[in-house]
Structure formats: structure tokens, C-alpha cells
Swiss-Prot record:
Keyword Membrane: no
UniProt source species: Candida albicans (strain SC5314 / ATCC MYA-2876)
Pfam families in UniProt: Ribosomal_L7Ae
GO molecular function: structural constituent of ribosome
Localization terms from the record: Cytoplasm
One term under GO cellular component: cytosolic small ribosomal subunit
Name of this chain's protein: Small ribosomal subunit protein eS12
GO terms classed as biological process: maintenance of translational fidelity; maturation of SSU-rRNA; ribosomal small subunit assembly; ribosomal small subunit biogenesis
Length: 143
């Protein structure tokens, strides 16, 4: 009986360590994957700008390494409209954002192959409520 009690204590400690170690990028990755499953992602500049102008967006993720400066200005302007400001996160790598948004092929081991870069991704539907979503919302409320 004492073995079972010790195992439960160890599991509780592990859960506490994992919840405290989640970074914004890890939370963003999980939120994008959940939103993709629930058909709530707008991937690419055309779909993202439509969702932003219709005010359907909950969150916008923009790539910093875009070569065209007008793309960055357009997305930032659509996110910062005075009626309703949409949270904006900037990511450094387009290929990484494309992989998170599902713009890739997966091999048998689950590794991403043939990743296509994404300049902008918009979350229109969060999907399921999760701890990662709450972490992102707390991050935006602090800013």
C-alpha cells in the first residue's frame, strides 16, 4: 500500500513541474495544433487578412523574417484597429510557423518533411479550452 501512495506523490510533483515549464512558444504550438484540428486556422496572408478585416480573428501570429515590409505593416495595422485590438505574436522563422500550422508532410515517425513557410497565421476558433490557451491569454493581459 505504501508503494501506491509514493507513486501518487511523484506523479503530482511531475505535473507541477510540467505546468510551470511551459513557454509561450510551446503554448502557441499546442494552440495552433488544436485550432487546426477544429478547422479554426487561416493560413497565409490572403486568408489571414480576410479574417482580420472581418474581425473573426482571436489571435494573429506573424513571421518577422518576411522580406516584404508592406506585409508586416498591413497585418499590424489590421490587428491594431481602434474598435477591437487583436493580440499579435511575432515568430522568427517562417518554416517553424508553417510546421506549427500544419503546412507540411509527416513521415512514419511523425517528423515534419517538406515544410512550407507561412508569413501569417490567424486563429479564428480556439477549439477546445486548454491550459496553453489560458497561458497565452494571461500573457496578452499582462502586456
Amino acid at each position: 500500500m505504501s508503494d501506491v501512495e509514493q507513486e501518487q506523490i511523484v506523479e503530482e510533483v511531475v505535473v507541477e513541474e510540467q505546468s510551470g515549464a511551459i513557454t509561450i512558444e510551446d503554448a502557441l504550438k499546442v494552440v495552433l495544433r488544436t485550432s487546426l484540428v477544429h478547422d479554426g486556422l487561416a493560413r497565409g496572408l490572403r486568408e489571414a487578412s480576410k479574417a482580420l478585416s472581418k474581425r473573426e480573428a482571436q489571435l494573429c501570429v506573424l513571421c518577422d523574417s518576411v522580406t516584404e515590409e508592406s506585409i508586416i505593416k498591413l497585418v499590424e495595422a489590421l490587428c491594431n484597429e481602434p474598435e477591437e485590438k487583436i493580440p499579435l505574436i511575432k515568430v522568427s522563422d517562417a518554416k517553424l510557423l508553417g510546421e506549427w500550422a500544419g503546412l507540411c508532410q509527416l513521415d512514419r515517425d511523425g517528423n515534419a518533411r517538406k515544410v512550407v513557410g507561412a508569413s501569417c497565421v490567424v486563429v479564428k476558433n480556439w477549439g477546445a479550452d486548454s491550459d496553453e490557451r489560458n497561458i497565452l491569454l494571461e500573457h496578452f493581459s499582462q502586456q
